[in-house]
């Protein structure tokens, strides 16, 4: 009887949908998920299944939905091999929103590959020129932001971004080509510690369906 009960509980967990309505993070089948937002007077919801999720938000100053992979320990691009991200989504939103890939290299070092955005979107930093990847033209941006460490000092966060000019909600991203292009523009990032698909809203409202997420790299 005990064996049957344990099997039943396991199946129920696998087939269930994880629903978030407050700041929270967790893991499902090797991927992490995270919901973070400001202004608790608004409403947010994130419903997560394996390799897909839906989300909605309104009356929120800032919201961040993520689904991706933590790479522990951090690895170089040579160690990861050919890194690709396959995705497909539908977004219906008003205001400043962006959709794409977010990642961390090391503490205070991050990067974005932005595939879709609304008219209110503000480019992230100073333009370093353009490049052609994945049958599309991207503009590269560099930005620095102060980070208050403690009362004794301030560090700076360094961010490199690729912003696709012809927006899309379905495709395959060749991460290596973006990373190598940032290097040519002065990027000194050495390690990759996190890769995620990101929906980011700033003073906006909307909903989204992410039908597919697959982050592929060599795992040892």
What are these regions (language model features)?
Residues 14, 88-95, 104-107, 165, ...:
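Short, flexible beta-strand-to-coil junctions
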Residues 68-76, 144-189:
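Beta-sandwich interaction modules
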Residues 2-16:
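Cleavable N-terminal signal peptides of Sec/SRP-targeted secreted and luminal proteins
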Residues 17-80, 86:
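Beta-strand-rich luminal/extracellular ectodomains of secretory-pathway glycoproteins
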Residues 21, 36-38, 45-49, 56-60, ...:
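A structural detector for beta-sheet-dominated domains
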Residues 169-220:
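Long, compositionally biased interface segments
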Residues 67-133:
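Extracellular-facing segments of soluble proteins and assemblies that are Gly/Ser/Thr-biased and enriched
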Residues 106-168:
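An exposed acidic His-Trp-rich patch
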């Amino acid at each position: 009887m005990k064996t049957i009960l344990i099997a039943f509980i396991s199946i129920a967990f696998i087939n269930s949908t994880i629903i978030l309505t407050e700041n929270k993070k967790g893991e499902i089948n090797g991927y992490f998920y995270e919901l973070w937002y400001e202004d608790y007077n608004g409403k947010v919801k994130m419903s997560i299944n394996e390799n897909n999720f839906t989300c909605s938000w309104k009356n929120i100053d800032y919201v961040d939905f993520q689904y991706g992979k933590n790479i522990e320990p951090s690895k170089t691009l040579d160690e990861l091999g050919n890194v690709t991200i396959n995705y497909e989504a539908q977004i219906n939103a008003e205001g400043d929103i962006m959709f794409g890939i977010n990642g961390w290299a090391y503490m205070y070092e991050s990067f974005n590959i932005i595939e879709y955005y609304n008219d209110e979107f503000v480019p992230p930093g100073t333009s370093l020129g353009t490049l052609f990847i994945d049958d599309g033209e991207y503009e590269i941006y560099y930005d620095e932001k102060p980070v208050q460490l403690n009362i004794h000092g301030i560090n700076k966060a360094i961010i490199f971004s690729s912003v696709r000019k012809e927006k899309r909600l379905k495709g395959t991203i060749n991460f290596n080509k973006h990373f190598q292009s940032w290097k040519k523009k002065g990027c000194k990032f050495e390690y990759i510690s996190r890769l995620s698909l990101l929906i980011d809203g700033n003073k906006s409202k909307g909903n989204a369906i992410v039908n597919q997420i697959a982050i592929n790299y060599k795992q040892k």
